[in-house]
Amino acid sequence: MARPDDPFESQDDVSDKSEDDELDEQDAVSLLTSDHAEVKQMFEEYRQLVQNDADDDRRGELAGRICSALTVHAEIEEDIFYPALRERLDDDLALDQAEVEHAIARDLIEQIVAMEPDDALFDARVLVLAEYVEHHVQEEESEIFPQAEKSGIDLDELGAALAERRHELRAELEAD
């Protein structure tokens, strides 16, 4: 059963198929774009919590969910999506830049995870991460995804591989 604060489980089990199952059937670009939208929504919620001076527990819980979602997303891109594209694309610069951006985001995530929500600069770090990720997403969706769609790669097969690995990583995080 999903915990109410679990960002990876659907709370709406009204059909035989869960939301996760439906997302798992997406092609690679659609799956990654859905992840982007999910994280964007969480960042918007975080901004609202900061603006409304929400308590530390609520901000800390949401920041943890954001960091977990970004960690899983970056790993599936780096382990599966980017290598598959490298085999098909002539120009690796956009992928190289995306991986560097992931490394910088990972550093910020590590700083956030090591902090408490009432620490100085906690909110600032989460909000800078939001801005950074929004920039990365914009580049990825406007440059890398169109290249992927034109590359001839089987995006459905790649989407299935991404979904499977994402499910494994989420299960590992939940077990910790």
PLM regions and their residue ranges:
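Small-residue-biased structural context
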Residues: 1-176
